[in-house]
Amino acid sequence: MHMQSPIQRRKSRQIHVGHVPVGGDAPIAVQSMTNTDTLDVDATVAQIRQLEAAGADIVRVSVPTMDAAEAFGQIKRQVSVPLVADIHFDYKIALRVAELGVDCLRINPGNIGREDRVRAVVDAARHHGIPIRIGVNAGSLEKDLQKKYGEPTPEALVESAMRHIEHLDRLDFQDFKVSVKASDVFMAVAAYRQLAQRIDQPLHLGITEAGGLRSGTVKSSIGLGLLLMEGIGDTIRVSLAADPVEEIKVGYDMLKSLRLRSKGINFIACPSCSRQNFDVIGTMNALEERLDDIMTPLDVSVIGCVVNGPGEAKESDIGLTGGDPANLVYIDGKPASKLRNDHLVDDLEALIRDKVREKEARERDTIAREA
């Protein structure tokens, strides 16, 4: 029920990673990367399916060897979400996964090798209709740029990216996106800002090696949040030393917070205090776990008392305000019913699921009328 995002997104050309449009007016895509051994086909397929179930639009898979490339081919046949092959050092691996049906090739200019090798990769991508991601990273800049700048800088990242963008331009290849990642928030943000002024290709955002679940979430939220608020970014990956599914959850929470994209429930909850009339934290933990399967966008407020509860509830699809002797439930901004604490989570879950079904039915009717 909240207003649309005021953010004006940067104009970028559109490419497709598999069936997913990236750039232009397409929704910002949320991406993650497997952390299984790619040679373990079953484990990698299982993780990709978990990521897809969590809402991943695109999944990147590391392909470090030719044996891994063959395993990638088996993996690709068993999943439906678009896959990006992460290639370093050996360009021949990129040529092989292109033959095996990869949806996008990620190459690192700092280690892929001579221009003739890049040309071979571009020729393969063109032949198979595959986009490329130029993935520049502060930790693996070309040696001449390391010598020129002395240390990684935003300017070094952008120069590396532009060097290879210009190479693709000379080869008349425009089907690519670009990233300029660093673990330092200031460096990454500055590099992306500079690059956004110079090219119109889609930008893949990320703070590389951001850290564990807590610290990585904070660092990524600051860096990516700054850029997204400026309209910069067409795909995102929240890099966490954690279960990759958490990357998807954090990514969507980030986009929901900026009203750029909604998937699943957007919870508004107070931190609780002595005025609470029910266990706010316990209720929230239970609801988040139970309703993790819902993908339909919905605003749900859970507020422990009447100080802010009614105001938040009036702006939510469903709002719970703590009260004595019973808690008040708002639906579509209007008081609807009262719930006691005895079965609060069960009753609230049922109301939320009913609202989701109602919203989904309304959307189906709208689609049917417009067909």
Swiss-Prot record:
Name used for this protein in its record: 4-hydroxy-3-methylbut-2-en-1-yl diphosphate synthase (flavodoxin)
Cofactor(s) it depends on: [4Fe-4S] cluster
Pathway terms, separated by semicolons: Isoprenoid biosynthesis; isopentenyl diphosphate biosynthesis via DXP pathway; isopentenyl diphosphate from 1-deoxy-D-xylulose 5-phosphate: step 5/6
Annotated catalysed reactions: (2E)-4-hydroxy-3-methylbut-2-enyl diphosphate + oxidized [flavodoxin] + H2O + 2 H(+) = 2-C-methyl-D-erythritol 2,4-cyclic diphosphate + reduced [flavodoxin]
Residues binding [4Fe-4S] cluster: 270, 273, 305, 312
Coiled coil: none
InterPro entries: Dihydropteroate_synth-like_sf (IPR011005), IspG_bac (IPR016425), IspG_bac-typ (IPR004588), NO2/SO3_Rdtase_4Fe4S_sf (IPR045854)
Catalytic EC class: oxidoreductase
